[in-house]
Amino acid sequence: MISFRNDYSEGAHPQVLAALEKNNLVTTCGYSMDDFCAEARGIVRARFSCPQADVHFMVGGTIANTTVIAAALRPWEGVIAADTGHINVHETGAIEASGHKVCAIETPDGKLTPALVREVMRRHCDGQDEHMVLPRMVYISDATELGTIYTKAELAALHEVCGEYGLYLFLDGARMAAALVAEGNDLQPEDFATYCDVFYLGGTKNGLLFGEAVVITNEALKPHFRNMIKQRGGMFAKGFLFGTQFTAYLQDELWLTMAPVSYTHLRAHETSQDL
């Protein structure tokens, strides 16, 4: 039986498991400061054409989202998201629990547009009313929770409107690989680094046992990010497991080879909900 309930019902790709077995008894230092993670960071930077980016590894999507948002926002600031966005629907109020409001807005397809961002800013008096939450970040997913994808023009337009209002653009890439191989996609990996202040490449939903690679391109978001990881409970002691997996994941484009399967399952699940 094939289950479409989620895209992490099985373990890991055999090549990933083989890499883990090979390095299983290698003695390393902890907390992702080892040579395996250093190698993986270099591969991530090269693949996304962002040599100056900071790369951090997190166990899963929710801890990645909460850590990035908490690190980027001041106490009175909030994050704009589609009403179907993962941080608004499926994270048990994790963002609000950290003290930041999710400024959700209804969308027809799970995607945000410049017009929707402007509407949220209008509702919040363009950030000029001290009695209201000040939106400071835009959160999007690619692929979205509805299985839709962004085009390069759409991502560039969001980047532009974020610059207009002084907003950070944060892309949840839990299903990034699926988006990149989807029919109609015209984005390349380097486009995420070009247009986003911070994004992450997901592995949990695409053949890794666990792991997301957070990529920070905006210099303002880089300082003390590891402090925030630790404070939020995301500092993984056996960090070499991230490095080993992501190196296997990105070498020979394994991440894109596996992606058509996960994208097909995602679309099948979403279609079944409409029956």
Task: Enumerate the language-model features and the residues they cover.
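Conserved core segment of the aminotransferase class I/II
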Residues: E212-F236, T247-E253
